[in-house]
Amino acid sequence: MTGLFRHRTFLRREDLKGSYDVVIVGGGVNGLSLSHNLAAHHGITDVAVLDANYIGSGGSGRNTQVVRANYNTPETVPLYKASLGIWRTLGQELDFNLLFSTQGELDLCHTHDSLEVEREKSLLNRAFGVQTDVLTPDEVRKACRFVDLTGGGELPVVGASFHPPGSFARHDSVVWGYAIAASRRGVHVHEGVAVTGIEISDGRCVGVRTEAGPVAAGRVVSAVAGHSTVLAAMAGVRLPIETMALQAFVTEPYRPVLEGLVSSMDLYVYVSQTARGELLVGAEVLPYTTYSTRSTFGFLAEASKRSLQILPFMAKARAMRQWTGLCDMTPDSSPILGDSGVDGFSLMAGMGTWGFKGAPIFGQTMAELIATGRTPALIEPFALSRFRLDRMVPDAASAGTH
């Protein structure tokens, strides 16, 4: 009776070496995506991923699992379109079930101004081959019969955009899928190893200091969403980032009612239903700087009120738990990818609300940059230098909530 069942597969436990070709600080989905791409596509396997806690303990384990490409600038749409393309076959590449499913995204508009923004976004998306449709209220009703077109009697729905490629992927599965795939190829994934400093010699980053001792490196990559400014400061790099909190909650399991994601562009709230039946509710990033992951009753009350304005059936559901993650928000609501200005120190930072969606393409393009020394065209607009050169990629309208 051998060979009938798959053996349980865990990460290989390796001793922390004194040096690596590449040290990636941060065991979230972006750091692990980079490690996998370095090993799988460039043969760079002398790589260490260091996480102060456990892999996926930060934003990767706290996001709401949304994957989409309906962004709003000529730079971001191709980037997330490429990422979505990788998502579709990523499970096969990693040999891991990511619970990926394409269900669509419905973004409701309660004002003509927001509807005009969605019309413009639809035109831009279509120009880059991304399907985003504009719907009338009657078409909204057909797309989701549970939507209250009166907006709770306060904000009637005047239209919507619908993004059929909108998808979901189980975040824990993605983290472990990347980690196990990288580990199989020789990457060392170290949990519980906190980085306490960056070693700089003659203006070049040459390694890190950890609680377990110094580790030399040919290149160090920061992939610590939520704490990017702290780590970068250790290398003498100042990042234009504010760290803010983003909360969400789920209800007790409810009968299957929702397919895809339903959001309101004016109420700043979104709802989806998980595979377990929970109704998942999120809202906008809190508008102040914090490193606290403490959840608040104020968010629970306000997000519940807003969700009932668009989906009144949720009054029958009971909130079960809530949580908070940290978002590194840049001035233009776009990521920072590439060199830091310090030789040997690279950045995967400013991941805001979009880090999970972009992780496959962020890892692929950053691996290419590290392996070849050439910046892929897709991420050229997202260099740190854009803030100094006044070449920002403003996309706040697409990235405020989910």
List the model feature ranges, each with a label.
Residues K17, L98-D107, K121, F128, ...:
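Helix-loop-beta segment of a Rossmann-like dinucleotide-binding subdomain
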Residues A39-S60:
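Glycine-rich FAD pyrophosphate-binding loop
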Residues T64-F146, Y268, R306-L308:
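Dinucleotide-binding Rossmann-like beta1-alpha1 core, especially the glycine-rich loop
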Residues S161-G218:
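Helical element adjacent to the flavin cofactor pocket in flavoenzyme catalytic cores
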Residues R238, P253-A349:
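Active-site lid/adjacent beta-loop-alpha segment flanking the redox-cofactor pocket in flavoenzymes
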Residues L308-H402:
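C-terminal catalytic lobe of FAD-dependent flavoproteins
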